[in-house]
Amino acid sequence: KLHLLGYGIEKDGGIYHMCEDIKSKKRELIHGIIDSLIARGYRFDKKDLEMLFSMNDKALTKVDIARLLVKYGEARSVNEAYNTILAPYKIGSKVRAEASVVTSLIKEDNGICILAHPGDIEKKYGIDILDILDDLRKIGIDGIEVFNSKHTPEDVVRFLKIAKERSLLITGGSDYHGM
């Protein structure tokens, strides 16, 4: 599971439409999670749900549900709600796209494609980013996110060296998803 970032893409291109389709699928999955939680005895205020689903520009996530669970006193924090009550519910695996498709669409839309938080990938999957970087470059990766809130200073030095040696673009980000 890789996170790819598209910079400078055209607003109404193929990647935009693919993201809109994914957003729509995620809304359906979020609706299903809420239905399941209600069946398990959790209560949701109708007005809160109406407001949540009226945000058409927003890609709904489990974090949105977690915030409501905290509001209703079902958990002390968003992280607690996310990691306990919502842990059994998987969304990401149901709305993924192949990396080659994503990079191709970003390129068709005149964008550049960046591999997000490579340090996180290494830690989660126990792989060395160098083992997959050449394959990623072949499918269109233009750069890597060197500066990231999850990267240690040593990670930053290492990824900066890797990017420079391979003439890859260098970016930074926080990986903040509202939690």
Where are these predicted regions, by residue range?
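Short Asp/Glu-rich motifs
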Residues: 56, 88, 125-126, 155
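A metal-dependent hydrolase metal-coordination microenvironment
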Residues: 1-60, 139, 145-179
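Hydrophobic, aromatic-enriched interface-forming segments
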Residues: 40-100
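Conserved, well-ordered alpha-helix/loop/beta-strand core segments that scaffold catalytic motifs
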Residues: 94-123, 127-137
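Short beta-strands and strand-loop turn motifs
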Residues: 84, 114-118, 143-146
